[in-house]
Regions:
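Terminal targeting signals and extreme-terminal segments of soluble enzymes
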Residues: 1-176
Length: 176
């Protein structure tokens, strides 16, 4: 007898107005606006089931509670969840330091997975902190812990700083 399939419905806001606001605001005010509900959260958080908890200059803290839909074929949470949490926390730590009109993108990511994450792990906290901020490159690190402080993974990143971000323009249709 086949088991009934489980389902999960994911909803999100159009990300383009938020992306435009991110270009117009400094990184820290923009991230604080997300926390205050004044800007919508990015779709990746809605999809993966995590959210920012705190932001301050050079630091970002995310929270996630692993669920069945995070599982891989061998009965543990897929490493992609931890990797995405770590990348998000580090990227946002960098973003807190950037003025309006300046963005970033991850160019290198090194992740160390230390132990399996399961439903029994419970709530996870992921804290990213900036290590270095230059005019073209930033580096950051992050740690993924449970609520008792047990370390599940850590990472470092190198981000490219993107200056003079222009608002995204619609692409013309063929024949225009």
């Amino acid at each position: 007898m086949a088991q009934e399939k489980k389902k999960r419905i994911v909803t999100w806001d159009d990300p383009m107005p938020g992306a435009a606001a991110a270009r117009e605001m400094g990184g820290l005010p923009f991230l604080r606006a997300i926390l205050a509900g004044e800007q919508p959260p990015p779709p990746i958080g809605e999809l993966m089931g995590f959210e920012p908890l705190e932001v301050e200059e050079g630091r970002a803290l995310f929270v996630c509670t692993p669920a069945e839909y995070h599982y891989n074929p061998i009965g543990a949470v897929h490493g992609g969840l931890a990797c995405t949490l770590l990348d998000s926390a580090m990227g946002c730590a960098v973003h807190t330091m950037l003025p309006a009109g300046v963005g970033y993108t991850t160019v290198e990511l090194k992740v160390s997975f230390l132990r399996p994450i399961t439903l029994k792990t419970g709530r996870l906290l992921c804290e990213g902190t900036i290590i270095y901020l230059g005019s073209r490159i930033a580096t950051a690190e992050a740690r993924l812990l449970d609520t008792s402080g047990k370390l599940y993974g850590h990472a470092t990143t190198t981000c490219m700083i993107l200056r003079n971000l222009a608002p995204e323009q619609p692409k013309p249709s063929v024949g225009e």
